[in-house]
Amino acid sequence: QPKSTPTLTMFPPSPEELQENKATLVCLISNFSPSGVTVAWKANGTPITQGVDTSNPTKEDNKYMASSFLHLTSDQWRSHNSFTCQVTHEGDTVEKSLSPAECL
């Protein structure tokens, strides 16, 4: 089975959620093979371990996909310049960043 590096897509928190003082970031990890991935989150480059929830990979068309969620408060979301979802797969590291300033 050929190796396929994951594609990352980041979704910011919804405005409705922010009004409730919550912020959930979603990192969609898709089109990878084999299924082993390690997900790490960072805020301004500093690793975050609390509030992280990563799904088990599911198979779709011979490739795998997974999602990772980062649960924050809206204050935490606004108080950082960038959030990064970093995925390690078969020795390769792929990362995608999201900036709260771009999502206002």
UniProtKB/Swiss-Prot annotation:
Residues 6-99 form the Ig-like domain. CDD domains: IgC1_L. It comes from the Eukaryota. Pfam families: C1-set. The keyword NADP does not apply. Keywords: Disulfide bond, Immunoglobulin domain. SUPFAM superfamilies: Immunoglobulin. GO terms for cellular component: extracellular region; plasma membrane. Disulfide bonds join C27-C85. This is Ig lambda-3 chain C region.
